[in-house]
Swiss-Prot record:
Function: Forms part of the ribosomal stalk which helps the ribosome interact with GTP-bound translation factors. Is thus essential for accurate translation.
Short name of any one Pfam family annotated for the protein: Ribosomal_L12_N
Recorded name of the encoding gene: rplL
Superkingdom of source: Bacteria
Lineage: Bacteria, Bacillati, Actinomycetota, Actinomycetes, Micrococcales
Coiled-coil region(s): none
UniProt protein name: Large ribosomal subunit protein bL12
Annotated SUPFAM superfamilies: ClpS-like (SSF54736), Ribosomal protein L7/12, oligomerisation (N-terminal) domain (SSF48300)
Family note: Belongs to the bacterial ribosomal protein bL12 family.
Keywords, ordered alphabetically: Acetylation, Ribonucleoprotein, Ribosomal protein
Organism this protein belongs to: Micrococcus luteus (Micrococcus lysodeikticus)
GO terms (BP aspect): translation
Length: 118
């Protein structure tokens, strides 16, 4: 099969068939058909982000365990920690390093909470 025959075969395909073809090519060759990201100001700003906010999205089923971890992380009293958990989504820590944010997220997810790092 030469290049022209391949192009003719592709022209005859439906949109669904083309979609399947693209997925098969991506899997076969380990590539992606996504448009490349243009390196610009936004990309540079994203790379430079050094401070992150840890937000408790929801407490999940193990609310008491989550309250204990929130107290440990924030240093809040029992009543204040319970209010934070009850009023989720709520920021727990702001302006922390990526490593610290990931550590906090792991502790909270370990006890069943949903956490976002922004």
């Amino acid at each position: 099969m030469n290049k022209e025959q391949i192009l003719e075969a592709i022209k005859a395909m439906t949109v669904l068939e083309l979609n399947d073809l693209v997925k098969a090519i991506e899997e076969e060759f380990g590539v992606t058909a996504a448009a490349p990201v243009v390196a610009g100001g936004a990309a540079a700003a994203a790379e430079e982000k050094t401070e992150f906010d840890v937000v408790l999205a929801s407490a999940g089923a193990e609310k008491i365990k989550v309250i204990k971890v929130v107290r440990e992380i924030t240093g809040l009293g029992l009543k204040e920690a319970k209010e934070v958990v009850d009023n989720a989504p709520k920021a727990l820590k702001e302006g922390v390093s990526k490593d610290e944010a990931e550590e906090i997220k792991a502790k909270l997810e370990e006890v069943g909470a949903s956490v976002e790092v922004k």
